[in-house]
Amino acid sequence: MSDVLSKKQQFSLKKLNKSLRKSTGQAIADYNMIEEGDRVMVCLSGGKDSFTMLDILLELRAAAPIHFEIIAVNLDQKQPDFPEHILPEYLQKLGVDYKIVEEDTYSIVQDKIPEGKTTCSLCSRLRRGILYRTAKELGATKIALGHHRDDLLATLMLNMFFGGKLKSMPAKLVSDNGEHVVIRPLAYCKEKEIEAYAKLKEYPIIPCNLCGSQPNLQRQVTKNMLNEWDVKFPGRLETMFTAMQNVVPSHLSDTALFNFKEIDKSSGVIDGGDLAFDKEPIKHHTEDITPIETQYYQQHQAVKIKQLT
């Protein structure tokens, strides 16, 4: 990060840091993500989200009433022109324990996936397997991923549009192989705050030229839609995320979640009866949004949306 920031930038950085720490700390507490004696493997991709996650977790650890370890892990997938020196230099300067895992998944993906097809599915499966193995080797008790609130919302929309499910990314889960606990400490954090924070911190961002840059991904299209909503209808994403934490099974249609067959007059009114829409507005904490972060997002993200449409 530059040694010299303007007073306005310093103020914005302080506000963003406070907001991100608060959101991350709240998510950790709500889901009991980190416990006494944990060894947390922080998956560092080189993107803005994982840099921010590592930064905030280190700060929270310094002030936490419990003791836990942090080790940063990066998977070098041998993509062409991958700058191998950046992360080791950054982590050494930061003074954090780390491990670089070298696995040529790039060649496997290129060999198996036809040209023009999205590579994310195979790439993510290979990456998960390697990270699970590494966590076991390191004795990690938790695996921390850098997905944020907007990722959770995009996944919810993707599953609704293309999977026929009301399903998102959980903030905490057991890994596919049943051997690890995976956590998402940034689950409550807004992407636009992370983006503004990373810009001010001047992290050495490493772009993903394997999957993240593919413009035809359904996920990217869905995120663009959500970003457009956020610009046109401020507060909509906050309301959507609140809905994910305020599920009413009796007013959905999943018989596995609610026993509709047993309902009769003696059951009484359940969760408001036949009110299909509760008109009481959701209150948002918009005062936590910093002016510089909002201005940066509106100027840059609106341009991206316009270009895509």
UniProtKB/Swiss-Prot annotation:
Catalytic activity: cytidine(32) in tRNA + S-sulfanyl-L-cysteinyl-[cysteine desulfurase] + AH2 + ATP = 2-thiocytidine(32) in tRNA + L-cysteinyl-[cysteine desulfurase] + A + AMP + diphosphate + H(+)
Chain span(s) of sequence motif PP-loop motif: 45-50
Residues bound to [4Fe-4S] cluster: 120, 123, 211
Pfam families (alphabetical): ATP_bind_3 (PF01171)
Record localization: Cytoplasm
Keywords linked to the UniProt accession: 4Fe-4S, ATP-binding, Cytoplasm, Iron, Iron-sulfur, Magnesium, Metal-binding, Nucleotide-binding, RNA-binding, Transferase, tRNA processing, tRNA-binding
Gene3D superfamilies in alphabetical order: HUPs
Signal sequence bounds: none
Documented EC number(s): 2.8.1.-
Textual note on the cofactor: Binds 1 [4Fe-4S] cluster per subunit. The cluster is chelated by three Cys residues, the fourth Fe has a free coordination site that may bind a sulfur atom transferred from the persulfide of IscS.
Cofactors: Mg(2+); [4Fe-4S] cluster
Function according to Swiss-Prot or TrEMBL: Catalyzes the ATP-dependent 2-thiolation of cytidine in position 32 of tRNA, to form 2-thiocytidine (s(2)C32). The sulfur atoms are provided by the cysteine/cysteine desulfurase (IscS) system.
Protein name per Swiss-Prot or TrEMBL: tRNA-cytidine(32) 2-sulfurtransferase
